[in-house]
Amino acid sequence: MEDFVRQCFNPMIVELAEKAMKEYGEDLKIETNKFAAICTHLEVCFMYSDFHFINEQGESIVVELDDPNALLKHRFEIIEGRDRTMAWTVVNSICNTTGAEKPKFLPDLYDYKENRFIEIGVTRREVHIYYLEKANKIKSENTHIHIFSFTGEEMATKADYTLDEESRARIKTRLFTIRQEMANRGLWDSFVSPKEAKKQLKKDLKSQELCAGLPTKVSRRTSPALRILEPMWMGSNRTAALRASFLKCPKK
């Protein structure tokens, strides 16, 4: 699974996931499914934010990266992907500026158009079950919840899906692609089932030495949302090598 993650996701997303797991004392060599889940969640959050801006009239617009209007205000503030200290600093700043109620748990995004925090969920289970779990944990009407599944289903607070249909379709397509690529490599069942995951981990550990010398193909493209986070954790020499838009899993 670890090899798949490094091949399938942008290196910047992988590094953010590594930092997140390290911050919580988790070993990605052992918890490979969690590693994959964190990378997937990060990518969905960045895709959610990509290309969405607010114009001078306060309207939400979708703008391609190379459009000169890209200097407009970003609609979403990205909180996910930052270390906890910085994330809470961003949340506090938003609350002080907008008057929003401070959430008890760190959300993933803030929507400047709707003036609300957003919690993004990506689930391998039924969307309504995961939605209820999120809602019971957060217990706040001020945090909007939006859940995506790998099967193309979604569920959001009061059926308010925030984004336009095309933007959500991009996210659903990406999740479906990840699922298919996992299935093609025999990883999907272990990703869904903890019991299968333990079996897969043993196989992964045995095959690591055999695969160590193999070349790895990784896309060097990234989303504009990720570029916002780059200065916090990447040197400019590495940043220059990464271009806009999202990667796709390499074919076998």
From Swiss-Prot:
Swiss-Prot/TrEMBL site (Important for efficient shutoff activity and nuclear localization) positions: K195, K198, K199
InterPro entries from the UniProt entry: PA/PA-X (IPR001009), PA/PA-X_sf (IPR038372)
Primary residence: host cell
Compartments it resides in: Host cytoplasm; Host nucleus
Transmembrane segments: none
Lineage: superkingdom: Viruses
Assigned keywords, A-Z: Decay of host mRNAs by virus, Eukaryotic host gene expression shutoff by virus, Host cytoplasm, Host gene expression shutoff by virus, Host mRNA suppression by virus, Host nucleus, Host-virus interaction
GO molecular function (one): RNA binding
Active site: E80, D108
Site entry: Important for efficient shutoff activity: L28, L65, K202, K203, K206
GO biological process, one term: viral RNA genome replication
Pfam families named in the record: Flu_PA
The keyword Nucleus is annotated on this UniProt entry: no
Described purpose of this protein according to its UniProt entry: Plays a major role in the shutoff of the host protein expression by cleaving mRNAs probably via an endonuclease activity. This host shutoff allows the virus to escape from the host antiviral response. Hijacks host RNA splicing machinery to selectively target host RNAs containing introns for destruction. This may explain the preferential degradation of RNAs that have undergone co- or post-transcriptional processing.
Record remark: domains: The probable endonuclease active site in the N-terminus and the basic amino acid cluster in the C-terminus are important for the shutoff activity. The C-terminus acts as a nuclear localization signal. The C-terminus is recruited to host protein complexes involved in nuclear Pol II RNA processing.
Family listed: Belongs to the influenza viruses PA-X family.
Name of this chain's protein: Protein PA-X
Native source species: Influenza A virus (strain A/Memphis/101/1972 H3N2)
